[in-house]
Amino acid sequence: MAFKVSRTEVWTVMIDDRPGGAADKLEALAKAGANLEVVFARRMPEQPGRGILFAGPIKGKKVVAAAQEAGFAKSDSIHGVKVEGGDKPGLGAKITRALANAGISFRGMSAAAIGTKFVSSIAVDSAEDAAKAVAALKKL
């Protein structure tokens, strides 16, 4: 099964854990014309009242400037890998086994299937792990 596998930049911003906290940040990107492929937000239990928002891609001068003005920063500690292709049963297991066999303990993963298409975003801890993940997943 052939997948398109690529590295992605991960941008993050702290948000208030309240209605509209994420919307405030995402609206700034939308106004600048961002076409985001990944958005993920979660509360931060260790910081009550706060959350973190992950988004990407952030590209183009206008979008980058808007992201920075809204408080986003490109993460140096989170490296992304995107996998996309045709959907088949068991892909999550195959992807996670390929990562395990490559010695990668990923820090986060999301996946979705829409119709016959599949896409997964994987977060790893280093550029080295991202390169290893891309190489391993291209072999699937």
Please place each PLM-identified region on the residue numbering.
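A conserved regulatory-domain signal marking ACT and ACT-like small-molecule sensing domains
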Residues: 1-140
